Amino acid sequence: MAHDTLYAIGEALIDMIPSKTGCSFAEVPSFSPRVGGAPANVCGAYARLGGDSALLTQLGDDPFGHKIIDELAACGIDTSHICLTDKANTALAFVSLEADGNRTFSFYRKPSADLLYAPEQVDTSLFANAYALHFCSVALVESPMREAHKTAIAAARSAGTIIDFDPNLRFPLWPDRDALRRTVLEFLPLADVVKISDEELEFLTGTSDIEAALPSLFVGHVQLVLYTCGNAGAHAYTRTAHGFSASKPVKAVDTTGAGDGFIGSFLWQLHKNGVDRAALPALQADQLNQWLDFSNRFCGYSVQRYGAIDSYPTIDQL
């Protein structure tokens, strides 16, 4: 059986996008609901480019939960493994947009339905047809969902699936910063691919110098580190090669989901070029440069539009 599908485990939620930018939440007259959540976004980016993707999560059996399922399915994402519950509601994230497109979040998630997703709900047989498993730190707070991650990661490791981790730090969701750091550093060695941003590097590694940080990132199973720096471009490192792509200036209106689009489009390129887990250590600089260029173009298109999945381009639009 071919290993084709990207699975992502974690949250799917509603991003409430403000109608007015450059102001506080109190000054926003209205919000528009858009489907989001980092794992869902990564599936969306992969699917928009023509790949097979599926989300492993749980939503509330409520209007927002059904909206998410309907819209993800319309994007080509396999939603058949999404569970519904009446024990909690679908998560909401209210977004505040600055004039430059950067954002802050206010979450309604104590707990939300996704955090109640339990290990026994993970169908481990799915990984026989998996290309990659993607996860983030948002769903790794103490909860059944955290344990479900461990079950999925172990099954993916046994099946030969590429495991990708984007810490995607969201400090307001954690009791304290030390708990978040400890959790990320616990899960990081379980991944083959790690994506980290310049805004996260010093918090997680103690240094803002990526070259100095690499020894603390190449731990456990990690073979590829993607380092994104916004307007300053993006880097990719194996233990022996380095790639870089400069960003082209664009007028950003909303950066929501940009990092998710980057990793989703990069994973799509790995799959398109037949890169399996065993091939990661041998990737060359010219390959990395080419794939970084593509993902930068993907993100450049996305940030000029509002929302996350809604803003992602197809291959023809690039």
Language model regions located:
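Conserved phosphate-binding/catalytic region of the ribokinase-like
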Residues: 1-7, 154, 208-318
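Short, conserved phosphate/pyrophosphate- and ester-handling motifs at nucleotide-, phospho-/glycolipid
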Residues: 46, 197, 259
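Conserved N-terminal subdomain of the carbohydrate kinase-like
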Residues: 52-135, 318
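Receiver (REC) domain switch/active-site residues of two-component response regulators
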Residues: 131, 192, 223
